Structures are given as structure tokens and as C-alpha cells.
């Protein structure tokens, strides 16, 4: 079994995100009492339809989050994780190594198994599925989506699938920057490669506790234009409500989930060969 070590280097991390706390982010945005995680559902649906079993995939801007790339694991042969903040990759390494202070993703693993067709997953089913996810990880990379080659020129056009969830839209207030960042992310795809992703909808900022971070204020029209111009086909863009606490699931449709946003975009497309 691999032991993943990711040095928590901070000297190169973004000054704009020097207050970033990956655990606080996970606790606020990935509680263990939500009714549905729509991005996990998207990946389960589109992964089986669009990807071949030997696919090579990368999660760009993975953050400290496990459930998205883990949902992709059953549909690909190799998975690479990349992020700008090294503390995020260090947080994922804790989960890969099963360290005592790792974040518990079993609630979301149970959810993804149900999306994959297993009606009542057992604890053993969850453990087995998480073992599968761990086995697909082949490496970490540090990425910078402001660069034309976010993970290096050698990786350009190397991937059958690129996953990027709330990455480009969550680091800038500027829509032109967002377009540039998304094109840089798309450049990692092979011809006929599949993009899967999500974005906050009509969001100008988001918060973790009392700390505010930038958002690009994009919507479905922005993505349709961008992806069509870049050469994607079979584009899917859904507008859905963000995950909601179970106790509130019946009333959240008429109330804001948060002050910043309450809807997300689910995005899938295949790059024309």
C-alpha cells in the first residue's frame, strides 16, 4: 500500500488565500447531514455514459475534497490530484493514509454507492468502495490555472477526463480571468476527452466562517458560450439547488441556502476530436 506524503509548503501558496483552513472549509461545505450532493450524482451519471474503463483522469483544483474524485474512481483507471494550495493536498493525503485525524467521507461514499445502483450499502460496501478510490490515485501535482499549462507543458492534452469543481469560479472576481482559467483547464484534455465540473451560480463571493473569498459571478449562459466556442459537443448544463441539510430539504427551495448563493451549475461535455 502506498503511503502518501505531501509536505505542507506554505511559502509558495497564494497570499490571497493565506487564511485558508481546509478543515473549516470541509466542515462548512461538506456536513454529514445533507439530502443530496448533486455533483456526486452528476459524476455517477456521466462517468458511466462518457468514459471508457481505461481512462486517465485528473482533478484540477481538487481542494481538500475527496467525494468528487472518489465518485469518478469507478469509471477510470488512473487518477491524478492537483491543487494550488499544498495544505489541501496534505489534507487528502491524510485520507489516503487513513490517518486518525482524516476527514470522514463515509456518508458521501454511502451516497455515491446509492447513485451507482446499490440500494442499501453496508459498512463493508463503503470500506470496499473507499479502497477502490484509494487504489486509483497515481500521484499529486501542484497546479496553477492562471498558467497556459496549469500542471506543466508535458501534461497538455494528456487526459481522457478532466474534473474541476468550483475551482476557476472561486478564485477571482473577474469573469475574463475565469474564462482564461477555464481554457487552461480544458487544455489538459485529449481530443474526445470529457470535462466534468460544477460552479457556483450567480455568486460574487463565498464565506468560510466570517472570511470572504472571491467568486466570478458566472451562470449557465457563460458556460454554454465558453464550451461551445472551445469545441465541446454533447454539452450538459443543469441548474440545481446546492446540497441542503436533511431537516431543511423541504423548505430550502424557497429560501437561500446561504447569503452568497443557493444554486450550482452541473457541467459535462465532450471535446470534439
Model-derived regions, located:
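Conserved class I S-adenosyl-L-methionine
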Residues: 52-65, 78-83
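Core SAM-dependent methyltransferase catalytic element
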Residues: 230-236, 240, 245-273
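S-adenosyl-L-methionine
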Residues: 97-151
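A short glycine-rich, Lys/Arg-flanked "PGG" loop and its adjoining helix->strand segment in the class I
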Residues: 155-156, 176-191
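Class I SAM-dependent methyltransferase Rossmann-like catalytic core
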Residues: 1-54, 67
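Acidic carboxylate diad motif detector
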Residues: 197-199
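Acceptor-substrate binding/catalytic loop of class I
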Residues: 173, 203-225
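A short acidic, Gly/Pro-enriched loop at the edge of an enzyme's catalytic core
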Residues: 148-162
Amino acid at each position: 500500500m502506498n503511503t502518501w506524503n505531501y509536505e505542507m509548503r506554505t511559502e509558495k501558496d497564494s497570499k490571497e488565500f493565506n487564511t485558508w483552513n481546509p478543515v473549516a472549509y470541509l466542515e462548512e461545505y461538506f456536513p454529514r447531514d445533507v439530502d443530496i450532493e448533486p455533483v456526486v450524482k452528476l459524476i455517477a451519471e456521466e462517468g458511466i455514459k462518457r468514459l471508457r474503463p481505461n481512462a486517465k483522469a485528473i482533478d484540477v483544483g481538487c481542494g481538500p475534497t475527496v467525494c468528487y474524485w472518489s465518485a469518478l474512481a469507478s469509471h477510470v483507471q488512473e487518477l491524478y490530484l492537483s491543487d494550488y494550495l499544498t495544505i489541501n493536498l496534505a489534507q487528502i493525503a491524510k485520507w489516503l493514509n487513513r490517518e486518525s485525524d482524516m476527514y470522514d467521507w463515509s456518508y458521501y461514499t454511502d451516497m455515491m454507492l446509492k447513485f451507482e445502483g446499490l440500494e442499501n450499502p453496508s459498512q463493508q460496501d463503503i470500506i470496499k468502495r473507499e479502497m477502490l478510490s484509494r487504489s486509483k490515485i497515481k500521484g499529486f501535482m501542484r497546479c496553477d490555472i492562471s498558467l497556459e499549462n496549469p500542471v506543466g507543458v508535458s501534461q497538455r492534452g494528456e487526459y481522457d477526463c478532466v474534473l474541476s469543481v468550483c475551482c476557476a469560479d472561486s478564485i477571482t472576481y473577474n469573469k475574463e480571468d475565469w474564462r482564461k482559467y477555464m481554457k487552461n483547464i480544458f487544455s489538459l484534455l485529449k481530443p474526445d476527452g470529457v470535462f466534468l465540473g460544477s460552479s457556483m451560480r450567480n455568486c460574487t463571493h463565498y464565506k468560510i466562517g466570517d472570511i470572504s473569498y472571491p467568486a466570478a459571478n458566472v451562470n449557465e449562459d457563460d458556460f454554454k458560450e465558453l464550451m461551445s466556442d472551445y469545441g465541446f459537443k454533447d454539452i450538459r448544463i443543469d441548474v440545481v439547488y446546492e446540497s441542503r441539510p436533511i431537516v431543511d430539504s423541504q423548505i430550502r427551495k424557497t429560501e437561500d441556502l446561504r447569503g452568497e448563493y443557493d444554486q450550482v451549475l452541473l457541467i459535462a461535455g465532450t471535446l470534439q476530436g
